[in-house]
């Protein structure tokens, strides 16, 4: 595989990763996932890729699998070396950013 694949669904937890990929100009194939609550086969298929069976899942070009939007967000920032979305380690803004990132994934995403 030469490009990343993002397993996604509109209105689910993949939005932050999609926005970040677009902002950084990174190429990723979007793989639309059916409603995991209504389609047991879709959940089983996703669980073959990522045992948690949650969206988002990012498949890296070398085949490694990433899940958890916060982890993907930090990885993409590290990969690009840019700090315009994610403050670099040691930056004064980093603690506040991390607090809001974790708040988003722990408190807001579960509501969707």
Q: Model-flagged regions — what are they?
A:
Residues 1-112:
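GST-like domain detector, emphasizing the conserved glutathione-binding G-site
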């Amino acid at each position: 595989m030469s490009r990343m694949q993002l397993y996604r669904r509109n209105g689910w937890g993949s939005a932050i990763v999609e926005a970040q990929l677009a902002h950084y100009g990174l190429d990723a194939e979007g793989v639309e996932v059916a409603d995991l609550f209504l389609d047991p086969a879709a959940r089983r298929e996703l669980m073959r890729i990522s045992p948690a069976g949650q969206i988002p899942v990012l498949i890296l070009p070398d085949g490694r699998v990433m899940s958890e939007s916060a982890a993907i967000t930090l990885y993409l920032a590290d990969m690009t070396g840019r700090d315009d979305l994610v403050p670099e380690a040691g930056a004064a803004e980093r603690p506040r950013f991390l607090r809001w990132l974790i708040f988003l994934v722990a408190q807001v995403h579960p509501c969707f």
